[in-house]
């Protein structure tokens, strides 16, 4: 019975709290900000490698066959 009463009181408390009254909002904003930076860094790293591979492919054109 104590568990049920505690659970109900906690549920009511959670439902009555406004979203801006806790620290979770700033936590999620900071997490999203960090996620954007990490994603951008990963994409830049991936595309940087990709561009170097494309440069090599242009330099060594497989369609040109030269016999020496």
From Swiss-Prot:
Belongs to the pleurocidin family. It comes from Pseudopleuronectes americanus (Winter flounder). InterPro entries: Antimicrobial12. It is found in: Secreted; Membrane. The keyword Membrane applies. This is Pleurocidin. Goblet cells. It is a peripheral membrane protein.
